[in-house]
């Protein structure tokens, strides 16, 4: 069954004694779970680690194993005395060994086994807390009969085998032995239950006859076991991941730095020098001074230019080459400070001896950085009612715990209530346990989807969903009482919780479950593998399935058993998602339309008579992603305001560095500051720019003629004055942002400025980052300002961002589900919207698998990073949760290079941006975007005959351009995200493998000839290339041939994680030990031959870029064009 969670607010304004009782119950439950967790942690007898109180993310030992053993022995000896034991007390080692055995029974995850916390809690709590309990000893006659007994009584065959299995399990179970040993040593009972201990201040109701422990204690004990089980599993995973990183580090060192120990020592010395020169780096993280790939961007060009200079050449010559490269690649350039250090004679060996060394060491540093952040042990945290709360649980009617009942319309229409069968009530300062408390709940639209099903069965209900024509059957599940976490920190100021909620779970049956089926029938056609649900098709089952379930075109969810359709989804940034729907059909159904065009389709592997026919493709837009002139103006204005403040802060930070004690750093910063035209970027407010320029003029008059102390004091005073000036701007900006209009979103068609778009979330993130940088800005070079422990800096904005992300994920997942079911959101004549069935439904939703995006030249890194951070993972999980009740399958497909090849032709291409209309106007006050200005300058388009919507190849953008044929000027254009969605379909139906377009090869010798040997990183690659090698005559194009009958085994690197494999690949590529080959399946680029990756994409770029440039140059130049404006943004 699918589980839905509905959070309702309890109306407690007129029930102060119940409000206080709920808060008291919350504290008691947390204290009780803490009590039992402490017992379990002592029985474990191993080190416990907590977060360091310094707030630096490090760990420290909270309690050593010896301290745990000492405290445990103290408790055990005290228990023997309290129990009046007069028999053998046992040695310390015997008691500790017995305690550990008990722990492994309670928490089997400690020894790598599995167990059910509910069953363990019910099995052990009574024997451990009641001296008369006989549970677990194998002699109790109460409880359910064994399964083999029930089978024998029912006359079912196989009961003898089941009995044998039960006896085998019983003989292997050490429970009885451990419990008897505890009794022999006078340790029964081992502990008092929490509700009977001196720690509890509640007047609990007396136990019923035959009741050994209260349900409150049973749930507390169960939650403590659940926490320890989860913690033990996590602790093992953390240790394994740490060991893997250590092994990865050692393997990388052995493979890359043997024989270069002197260079390793030198680069460590370089990093130490940079650390000492910039103490502020350590305020971010301990590895902030490490050499990174980002800091080395452009190093190949810089080192090439430097190689022509003498080692003892003046620094000015080296610095000039740095600036030349930086000027040509402003957005693809690394750290000027790092290059300046590398130009010093003592560090030149790092790039003169081996130009690839620093690149490889940057990869190595990425491993060290992960190792530095990794933990060897999981952090152990005890429950706390305010800091680390757990929630009080209730069971449905008829359950094993304290129960609740949902009362429909108890106080009128839509005015529901909750009846708690047991609760606490505080009167005159005394908390007492009471029975049957009815609490009204606030109205909620979510509750309107619940309808009572049977008055004789209070837990039975109907669940209404807009994605189904009929109601789903369901039942109430468990529930939790929850408080708002932001209010818990202030509970010491009040006696009770302010806002209290009940989180109710509802178990809903899908259509297939209602028919008595475990899965829908089409689930047999697809295979979903692993946690990522990688999708594969059982091609041999397609024909039989379609014969049993012919396509009759039913619309909406009623058509799920009609035909077979797949909807692929490409998540984007500009629009939330792009979808493409394909239907499995017979090939003879493909009929040309009135224009003679055959429908777009993909062949299906192994099925000559079946094809996947394209039905529809479209963009899914959420509120905030629609475009209009007015909306764009508002969005650009608020971005421009924030961009001005960020630019001013960047200049202010550069001015601070001009006052550094390090002379070299100071002079480089000063040179950089005065060389940059302050007003050219047009990213500052005029008044602040004027104030800043005035301070620069004052400093220019002092530079070079005053002492270091006077210069640093002058810089500090200048910083302080412009910082104060900017402070007023920041305050005014914050005031405007807080008072800005926030339009309410209803439906999917409303135009709003922000809405649920990623652009809006990124804008909020940039606000937060700017405020953080501004609040912790140091006015003295090297000054480090950190947030105080427990700081709630910009907590409201942070919560707003988190809620915006959660809201986007849920809305996007809901929209994808409805689109897959064939529903569209339509407005009636009154403007009221509702979901209407318009298309036949899809049985499978296919997402791109982004976790394997390890290739540097695939999707733009910035775009992939934004999707990976939270959006894709969150949508995937939310889709799985929502799709289950609708019987929809959710899978993923290998997505590497799906945005770089045309789905129709297979040809590679480039993503392009359109020229903005404003850049073609006669009098354009705004500068060109940086990408357009770069294109114009590179191709010397002085006359700039640009038109609106001209395509500019940038590698980013929403238009994908690829060659359509080998003929010159024959190109295909399509929306890039729609193309990526269609590529996922092509890969699904063709059983795609990456080796069809990309191969990693190593240099080697075969029969005395230097050849490329394919790296067999998987079974598919091994099947195709285990006995093949590649040779070349040009060093660019490679041809394959067989190397003999002997087939090689799969490459050992298959055992590595894909991330580690790609790290090793990057290092090999830097040393030219391996080569990546690409090919064009369409045969257009280099006739479809295998080509070195760099040259392959160069051929693609030259072909498309040349065509687009030729188109622009073929026009009549526009006179006095505004295109001479070459500003940059």
From Swiss-Prot:
- Keywords in UniProt for this one? Antiviral defense, DNA-binding, Endonuclease, Hydrolase, Magnesium, Nuclease, RNA-binding
Its taxonomic placement starts with: Bacteria, Bacillati, Bacillota, Bacilli, Bacillales
**What does the UniProt record report as the effect of altering residue 899 to A in this chain?**
Nearly complete loss of cleavage of target DNA
Q: Where is this region: Binds sgRNA?
A: 4-9, 442-446, 742-746, 753-754, 792-796, 800-819, 835-839, 973-978
Region (REC1 (Helical-1)domain) location: 15-386
Q: What is the recorded phenotype of mutating residue 1015 to A? A: Dramatically reduces cleavage of target DNA
UniProt binding sites for phosphate: 899, 911
Q: Explain how, and how many, cofactor molecules are bound.
A: Optimal in vitro activity occurs in the presence of Mg(2+), but there is weak activity in its absence. A more complete study shows a preference for Mn(2+), although activity is seen with Mg(2+) and Ca(2+) also.
Q: Where is this region: Bridge helix domain?
A: 629-658
Q: Which NCBIfam families match?
A: Cas12b (NF033949)
What more is known? Part of a type V-B CRISPR-Cas system.
The task this protein performs is described as: CRISPR (clustered regularly interspaced short palindromic repeat), is an adaptive immune system that provides protection against mobile genetic elements (viruses, transposable elements and conjugative plasmids). CRISPR clusters contain sequences complementary to antecedent mobile elements and target invading nucleic acids. CRISPR clusters are transcribed and processed into CRISPR RNA (crRNA). In type II CRISPR systems correct processing of pre-crRNA requires a trans-encoded small RNA (tracrRNA), endogenous ribonuclease 3 (rnc) and this protein.
Please give the annotated consequence of changing residue 574 to A: Reduces cleavage of target DNA
Stretches of the chain forming a coiled coil according to its record: none
Q: What is this protein called?
A: CRISPR-associated endonuclease Cas12b
Name the residues annotated as site: Binds 'phosphate lock' on target strand DNA. Answer: 478, 507
Q: One biological-process term from Gene Ontology?
A: defense response to virus
Q: Region Nuc-I domain: start and end of each range?
A: 901-974
Outline the subunit composition: Monomer.
Residue ranges, annotated region (WED-I (OBD-I) domain): 1-14
Give the originating organism. Alicyclobacillus acidoterrestris (strain ATCC 49025 / DSM 3922 / CIP 106132 / NCIMB 13137 / GD3B)
Q: How does activity depend on temperature?
A: Optimum temperature is 50 degrees Celsius cuts between 37 and 60 degrees Celsius.
Documented applications: The simplicity of the Cas12b-crRNA-tracrRNA endonuclease activity can be used in vitro to target and cleave a DNA sequence of interest, even in the presence of human cell lysate. Fusion of the 5'-tracrRNA:crRNA-3' into a single-guide RNA (sgRNA) leads to a protein-sgRNA system that endonucleolytically cleaves target DNA in vitro.
Region RuvC-III domain, as annotated, extends over 975-993
Q: Site feature Disrupts base stacking adjacent to scissile phosphate: at which residues?
A: 853
Single GO MF descriptor = RNA binding
Record remark on domains = Structures show 2 discontinuous REC (recognition, residues 15-386, 658-784) and NUC (nuclease, residues 1-14, 387-658 and 785-1129) lobes composed of several domains each; the boundaries given correspond to Lui et al., but Yang et al., differ only by a few residues in most cases. The crRNA (or single guide, sgRNA) binds in a central channel between the 2 lobes. PAM recognition is sequence specific and occurs mostly via interaction with the REC1 (helical-1) and WED-II (OBD-II) domains. The sgRNA-target DNA heteroduplex binds primarily to the REC lobe in a sequence-independent manner.
């Amino acid at each position: 069954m699918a589980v839905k969670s509905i959070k309702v607010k309890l109306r407690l304004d007129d029930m102060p004694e119940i409000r206080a009782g709920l808060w008291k119950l919350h504290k008691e439950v947390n204290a009780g779970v803490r009590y039992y967790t402490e017992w379990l942690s002592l029985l474990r007898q191993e080190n416990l680690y907590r977060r360091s109180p310094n707030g630096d993310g490090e760990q420290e030992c909270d309690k050593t194993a010896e301290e745990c053993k000492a405290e445990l022995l103290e408790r055990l000896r005290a228990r023997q005395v309290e129990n009046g034991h007069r028999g053998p007390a046992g040695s310390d080692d015997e008691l500790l060994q017995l305690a550990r055995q008990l722990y492994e029974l309670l928490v089997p995850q400690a020894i790598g086994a599995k167990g059910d916390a509910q069953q363990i809690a019910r099995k052990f709590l009574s024997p451990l807390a009641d001296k008369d309990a006989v549970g677990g000893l194998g002699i109790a006659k109460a409880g359910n009969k064994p399964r083999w007994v029930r089978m024998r009584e029912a006359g079912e065959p196989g009961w003898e085998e089941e009995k044998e299995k039960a006896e085998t399990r019983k003989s292997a179970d050490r429970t009885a032995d451990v419990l008897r040993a505890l009794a022999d040593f006078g340790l029964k009972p081992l502990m008092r239950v929490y509700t009977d201990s001196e720690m509890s201040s509640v007047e609990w109701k007396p136990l019923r006859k035959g009741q050994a422990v209260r349900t409150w204690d049973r749930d507390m004990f169960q939650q403590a076991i659940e926490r320890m089980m989860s913690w033990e599993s996590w602790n093992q995973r953390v240790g394994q991941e740490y060991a893997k990183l250590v092994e990865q580090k050692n393997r990388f060192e052995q493979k890359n730095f043997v024989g270069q120990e002197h260079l390793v020592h030198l680069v460590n010395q370089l990093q130490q020098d940079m650390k000492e020169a910039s103490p502020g780096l350590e305020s971010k993280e301990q590895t902030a001074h490490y050499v990174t790939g980002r800091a080395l961007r452009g190093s190949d060009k810089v080192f090439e230019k430097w190689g022509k200079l003498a080692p003892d050449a003046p620094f000015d010559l080296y610095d000039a080459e740095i600036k030349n490269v930086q000027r040509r690649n402003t957005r693809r350039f690394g750290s000027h400070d790092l290059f300046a250090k590398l130009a010093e004679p003592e560090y030149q060996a790092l790039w003169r001896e081996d130009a690839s060394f620093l690149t490889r060491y940057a990869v190595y540093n990425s491993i060290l950085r992960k190792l530095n952040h990794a933990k060897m042990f999981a952090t152990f945290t005890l429950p706390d009612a305010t800091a680390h709360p757990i929630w009080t649980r209730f069971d449905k009617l008829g359950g094993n715990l304290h129960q609740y009942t949902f009362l429909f319309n108890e106080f009128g229409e839509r005015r529901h209530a909750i009846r708690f069968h047991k609760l606490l009530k505080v009167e005159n300062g005394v908390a007492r346990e009471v029975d049957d408390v009815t609490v009204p709940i606030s109205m909620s639209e979510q509750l309107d989807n619940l309808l009572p099903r049977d008055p004789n069965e209070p837990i039975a209900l109907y669940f209404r969903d807009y994605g189904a024509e009929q109601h789903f059957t369901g039942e109430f599940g468990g529930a939790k009482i929850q408080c708002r976490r932001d209010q818990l920190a202030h509970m010491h100021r009040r006696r009770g919780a302010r806002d209290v909620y009940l989180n109710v779970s509802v178990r809903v049956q899908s259509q297939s479950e209602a028919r008595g089926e475990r899965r829908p029938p089409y689930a047999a056609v697809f295979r979903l593998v692993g946690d990522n649900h990688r999708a594969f098709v059982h091609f041999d089952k397609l024909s039989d399935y379609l014969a049993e379930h012919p396509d009759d075109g039913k619309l909406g969810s009623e058509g799920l058993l009609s035909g077979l359709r797949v909807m692929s989804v490409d998540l984007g940034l500009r629009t939330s998602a792009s979808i493409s729907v394909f239907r499995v059909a017979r090939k003879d159904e493909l009929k040309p339309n009135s224009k003679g065009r055959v429908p777009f389709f993909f062949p299906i592997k192994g099925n000559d008579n079946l094809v996947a026919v394209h039905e529809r493709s479209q963009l899914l837009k959420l509120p905030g992603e629609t475009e209009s002139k007015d909306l764009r103006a508002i969005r650009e204005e608020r971005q421009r305001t924030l961009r001005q403040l960020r630019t001013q802060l960047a200049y202010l930070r550069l001015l601070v560095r001009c006052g550094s004690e390090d002379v070299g750093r100071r002079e480089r910063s000063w040179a950089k500051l005065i060389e940059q035209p302050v007003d050219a970027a047009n990213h500052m407010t005029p008044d602040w720019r004027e104030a800043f320029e005035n301070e620069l003029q004052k400093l220019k008059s002092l530079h070079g003629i005053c002492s270091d102390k006077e210069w640093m004091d002058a810089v500090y005073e200048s910083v302080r004055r412009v910082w104060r000036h900017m402070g007023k701007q920041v305050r005014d900006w914050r005031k405007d942002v807080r008072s800005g209009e926030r339009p309410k979103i209803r439906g999917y068609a409303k135009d709003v400025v922000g809405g649920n778009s990623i652009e809006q979330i990124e804008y909020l993130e940039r606000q937060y980052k700017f405020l953080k940088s501004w609040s912790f800005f140091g006015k003295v070079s090297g000054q480090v300002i950190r947030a105080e422990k427990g700081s709630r800096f910009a907590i409201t904005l942070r919560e707003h961002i988190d809620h915006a992300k959660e809201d986007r994920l849920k809305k996007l997942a809901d929209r994808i589900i409805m689109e897959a079911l064939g529903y569209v959101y339509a407005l009636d004549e009154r403007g009221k919207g509702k979901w209407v069935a318009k298309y036949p439904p899809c049985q499978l939703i296919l997402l791109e698998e982004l976790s394997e995006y390890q290739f540097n030249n695939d999707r733009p890194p910035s775009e992939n990073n934004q999707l990976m951070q939270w959006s894709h993972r969150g949508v995937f999980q939310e889709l799985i949760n929502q799709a289950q009740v609708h019987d929809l399958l959710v899978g993923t497909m290998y997505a590497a290079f799906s945005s770089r090849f045309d789905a129709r032709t297979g040809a590679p291409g480039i993503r392009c941006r359109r020229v903005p209309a404003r850049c073609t106007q006669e009098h354009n006050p705004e500068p060109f975007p940086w990408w357009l200005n770069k294109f114009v300058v590179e191709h010397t388009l002085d006359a700039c005959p640009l038109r609106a919507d001209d395509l500019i190849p940038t590698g980013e953008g929403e238009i994908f351009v690829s060659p359509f044929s080998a003929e010159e000027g024959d190109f295909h254009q399509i929306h890039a995200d729609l193309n990526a969605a269609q590529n996922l379909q092509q890969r699904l139906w063709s059983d795609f493998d990456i080796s069809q377009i990309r191969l990693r090869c190593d240099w080697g010798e075969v029969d005395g000839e230097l050849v490329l040997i394919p790296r067999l990183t998987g079974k598919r690659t091994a099947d195709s290339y285990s006995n093949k090698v590649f040779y070349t005559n040009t060093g660019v194009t490679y041809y394959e041939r067989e190397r003999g009958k002997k087939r090689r085994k799969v490459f050992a690197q298959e055992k590595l994680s894909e991330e580690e494999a790609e790290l090793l690949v990057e290092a090999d590529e830097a040393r030219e030990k391996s080569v990546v080959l690409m090919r064009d399946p369409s045969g257009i680029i280099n006739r479809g031959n295998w080509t070195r990756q760099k040259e392959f994409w160069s051929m693609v770029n030259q072909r498309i870029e040349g065509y687009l440039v030729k188109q622009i140059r073929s026009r009549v130049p526009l006179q006095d064009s505004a295109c001479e404006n070459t500003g940059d943004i």
